[in-house]
Structures are given as structure tokens and as C-alpha cells.
Design a protein with these regions (language model features):
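Radical SAM/AdoMet-radical enzyme domain recognition
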Residues: 39-60, 68-183
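Conserved, mostly hydrophobic/aromatic
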Residues: 17, 116, 234
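Short, charged, surface-exposed secondary-structure boundary motifs
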Residues: 124-128, 190, 248
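Flexible glycine/acidic-rich beta-alpha junction loops that bind and position SAM and/or redox cofactors
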Residues: 178-197, 211-221, 246
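Hydrophobic, well-ordered secondary-structure segments
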Residues: 108, 168, 198-218
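Acidic beta-to-alpha connecting loop that harbors the catalytic carboxylate
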Residues: 63
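Canonical Radical SAM [4Fe-4S] cluster-binding loop centered on the CxxxCxxC motif
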Residues: 2-38
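Accessory C-terminal segments flanking Radical SAM cores
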Residues: 207-277
């Protein structure tokens, strides 16, 4: 049963990170209109019809979601009853450059988890993420001032992080929060084996997101075609890494239409990487 979706509410970003694999998918990513309210209606219908205890929505995808903050606010307010009741758990991941007190207090009020992308130490982060380390650290401190704790953090793991593994782990140990390490894919990608070796090392001292049927990019098993789908460009895809492949359908289709997907592959490996070998 579908109980988790990701919605790419826009296809634009205020950064041009060197390793972003969406650069390689640019011809498949467009600004086609998508009725997010219809998607949310379909989610609410499925929650009520199937008595789903918690439905997870990630407002994440091909760009920086806070570039469309006013629309994002409307989406959050539209499902606020379900957020307040805990029936929907919503989150987003941001580069932090647009964080301010008003935005962070709004998301805190409506129980939307804010994750921030930071690639560890200044040298590595600035190499790939447009020399923004100091600004991201300021955003992290602002979040802590408002929420009384540090935000969850996302670190993309490429060769530079591997080369500075001990320094990276030491950097994140200062925050005492949950860290998602994401395997770099595409042109600058690293192998699954190298990534998993790093995860094992990091997990010995950090609270690292791992395990379960989720995504091999985050250290779990590939959950493509099981209980989650990805919305972008007015379409539905098996996952966010597959927006340059044939869509499963259009974004206005009910969730029930995607319930009977069946894919036979080794889920220790990424679905797309498996079929593209």
C-alpha cells in the first residue's frame, strides 16, 4: 500500500552544486504545471479509506522548495488538520540559504520537519556546494535558536568526503542529531560498496539513517515500486532517480492506481542502476 510520497513542488534551485545529478537529467525536467492540491486530496482520501495510521509526505525533489515558499505554505495549510493530528508526517530538505525566522516558526507550528544539506567540513562542502558553508552554519544556528535543537542534516558522500572521513564524522558528532548520508550518484558518483563501508564507520559513533526498504542512496534497501512514489513534472515516477524514464502515470491519478506495481530485482541495489547495467 502506498503510504509515502515525495512531491517536487518546483524544478529550480538557487545553487548550482557541482555534483547535482539533476544536471544530467535536465532535458527530462521541465516546468510543467502540477496540481499539488489534487495530489493532497488523493492522499487524504487514501488515508481515510485505508485507515492509514501515518502517511509520510516529502516536499523534496528537483530543486530548492523554499523558492516557492508561498505555494509551499498553502500546501501545508491545506493538510494542517492531518499534520496536527499526526496522520500526515511531512518533511522537506533545503540548502538553508532562504531560511529565516518567519519560515522556520511557520514550519515548527505545523510540525513540518526541516532538513538541511551540509557536506561536513568547510573544505569539502565549499568544493561542491558553491562556497556556502558559513551561510549554512548560520541557518543551522537560527534553527536551533527557534527549535531548541539542531535540524536533521543531509550530507552527500563523494570522493572528497571519503578522503576526509574521520574529519566528516567528527564534524557531525558535535550536533547530536540524526544524519542522512546520501551516496553521490551520476558523473561524480561513488560505488555502493565504498559508500556502505563509510556508513558502517560513521554509524559506530553517529545517529545515522540506515536500513529498511527506502533507498540505497541512504544506506537502505531499494524501495522502488513498493510503498512510495515520486511526483514531478505533472507525472508519477517510480522514484526520484527515474525522472528521465517513462512515468507510471499522471499526477492526478488516485493512489490506488499504483498499488499493484511489481518489480523483481535485487533490492540491495538501486533499481535504476540495476536496469541500466
Amino acid at each position: 500500500m502506498i503510504d509515502r510520497i515525495c512531491i517536487s513542488i518546483n524544478n529550480r534551485c538557487n545553487m548550482a552544486c557541482k555534483y547535482c545529478h539533476f544536471h544530467e537529467k535536465a532535458s527530462s525536467i521541465c516546468g510543467q504545471d502540477m496540481d499539488v492540491f489534487k495530489i493532497l486530496d488523493n492522499v487524504v482520501y487514501s488515508i481515510e479509506k485505508n485507515n492509514i495510521h501515518v502517511f509520510k509526505i516529502g516536499f523534496v525533489g528537483n530543486g530548492e522548495p523554499l523558492l516557492d515558499y508561498e505555494k509551499f505554505k498553502e500546501y501545508v495549510l491545506y493538510i494542517s488538520k492531518y499534520l496536527d493530528d499526526g496522520r500526515i508526517a511531512a518533511y522537506t530538505i533545503s540548502n538553508g540559504l532562504l531560511w529565516d525566522r518567519e519560515k522556520l516558526e511557520f514550519f515548527k507550528l505545523h510540525r513540518v520537519n526541516m532538513g538541511i544539506s551540509i557536506d561536513g567540513i568547510e573544505e569539502v562542502h565549499n568544493e561542491y556546494r558553491c562556497n556556502t558553508h558559513s551561510r549554512v552554519m548560520e541557518a543551522i544556528q537560527l534553527y536551533k535558536d527557534i527549535n531548541g535543537k539542531y535540524p536533521s542534516m543531509n550530507c552527500t558522500v563523494g570522493e572528497s568526503v571519503i578522503e576526509h572521513a574521520d574529519e566528516t564524522i567528527a564534524f557531525f558528532s558535535e550536533f547530536e542529531n540524526r544524519i542522512t548520508f546520501s551516496r553521490m550518484i551520476g558523473k561524480y558518483g561513488i560505488s555502493l560498496g565504498v559508500f556502505n563501508d563509510f556508513l558502517r564507520k560513521a554509524s559506530s559513533s553517529l545517529n545515522v539513517r540506515t536500513g529498511g526498504y527506502d533507498c540505497t542512496m541512504y544506506g537502505g534497501m531499494c524501495g522502488a515500486g513498493m510503498n512510495n512514489i515520486f511526483y514531478s513534472n505533472g507525472n508519477v515516477y517510480i522514484c526520484g532517480n527515474c525522472v528521465d524514464m517513462e512515468p507510471l502515470g499522471t499526477s492526478d491519478m488516485p493512489l490506488a492506481d499504483f498499488e499493484n506495481l511489481s518489480y523483481d530485482f535485487d533490492r540491495k541495489h538501486c533499481y535504476k542502476e540495476t536496469i541500466c547495467e
